[in-house]
Amino acid sequence: MMKRILKWAALLLAALTLYSLFCALSIVRYAERDESAPADCIIVLGAGTDGKMPSPVFRERLHHAVTLYQEGYSDIILLTGGYSPGNEHSDAWIAGAYLQSLGIPEDAVLLEERSTITQENLRFAKEIMENENLSTCILVSDPLHMKRSMMMAKEYEIESFSSPTPTTRYQSWRTKLPFLARVTFFYVGYQVYKIFAKV
């Protein structure tokens, strides 16, 4: 009996490992996809702040959003990110102030200030889009983060165009691999969660 249990456990582990590797490859391939097209708004997924300035990763996303805005893809930028512990302002507010320093007018920016994770970024952004009568968006994040983000956007029925940042803080494989492993873990975990949520 115990041998049979161990055998099935080993098979399950092997299957999960192979599936995770497949997902990792899919994430890497998807990272190269840029679907930028005219849309009602540009959603920038949050990536933390130090209380005064967006993190380096967040700044890369903001710079890309500014480029899309200046190139005429949309005239509204929707920033996401709630309050980090100890911070006076939300991550979205700090990002908004940063955009203003880059010349983006205040009335071109919408703030989503409740979220703490990617799933909430999109759920609460969806509510703002509905309130503002916005139907489509360009979704901005890091290349390796795009597949999971687009999957979640689809879950919330947000018509989105993938637009990964052309530059990223994860340049070498030394920095890419840990980030890819983390993204893959959460990607697979979210799919498993959806399966059990339906049971």
Residue ranges of predicted features:
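N-terminal type II signal-anchor transmembrane helix
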Residues: 2-34
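Enrichment for repetitive, rod-forming helical segments
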Residues: 10-14, 68, 189
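A structural signal for short, hydrophobic/glycine-enriched beta-strand patches
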Residues: 23-180
